[in-house]
Amino acid sequence: MANNDQKRDEGYIEKLVQVNRVAKTVKGGRIFTFTALTVVGDGKGRVGFGRGKSREVPAAIQKAMEAARRNMIQVDLNGTTLQYPIKSAHGASKVYMQPASEGTGIIAGGAMRAVLEVAGVQNVLAKCYGSTNPVNVVHATFKGLKTMQSPESVAAKRGKSVEEIL
């Protein structure tokens, strides 16, 4: 498991979550290929993830970064934390994320931490249950962040004021 921080000119924070080597056995021996899982974000609520496959590690990482930039979503944050507690699942991975007070930091492990860091969340309590496969944890985290809505957006959809909703 690797963990890199890189800044690009576009202002995106890129993190490498996982590199995995797989082997295909053929008549002449084994063919090794690599898969990379990366997350990309601007630190202000835009975040994306991608997977890339190649015979070389750098090429797999590059493909994953490009896929992550194409697969970006906007997350409605409440300052530096989440709007409300979120439960989400993908496959056998289940994640729970809850807003935290200022100064708490990111209390999350592994793949979930990488997603929350690049999304711009600075105060959160998070826990992963079930499978801790990084691919499924990232998917579950994204599902949860994608479903989260701010009170302003809910009020606008219902045609009411924020005070009526809260």
Curated annotation (Swiss-Prot):
One GO cellular component, as annotated: small ribosomal subunit
Classification via Gene3D superfamilies: 3.30.160.20, 3.30.230.10
Keyword annotations of the record: Ribonucleoprotein, Ribosomal protein, RNA-binding, rRNA-binding
UniProt cross-references to PROSITE patterns, sorted A to Z: RIBOSOMAL_S5 (PS00585), S5_DSRBD (PS50881)
Every S5 DRBM domain range: 12-75
GO biological process: translation
Pfam family name, one: Ribosomal_S5_C
Keyword Ribosomal protein attributed: yes
GO terms, molecular function: rRNA binding; structural constituent of ribosome
SUPFAM superfamilies found in the cross-reference section: dsRNA-binding domain-like, Ribosomal protein S5 domain 2-like
Domain of life: Bacteria
InterPro entries with a match to the protein in the record: Ribosomal_Su5_D2-typ_SF, Ribosomal_uS5, Ribosomal_uS5_bac-type, Ribosomal_uS5_C, Ribosomal_uS5_N, Ribosomal_uS5_N_CS, Ribsml_uS5_D2-typ_fold_subgr
Family per similarity comment: Belongs to the universal ribosomal protein uS5 family.
SUBUNIT field: Part of the 30S ribosomal subunit. Contacts proteins S4 and S8.
Free-text comment about domains: The N-terminal domain interacts with the head of the 30S subunit; the C-terminal domain interacts with the body and contacts protein S4. The interaction surface between S4 and S5 is involved in control of translational fidelity.
NCBIfam families for the chain: rpsE_bact
Role of this protein: With S4 and S12 plays an important role in translational accuracy. Located at the back of the 30S subunit body where it stabilizes the conformation of the head with respect to the body.
Protein's UniProt name: Small ribosomal subunit protein uS5
Protein's organism: Ectopseudomonas mendocina (strain ymp)
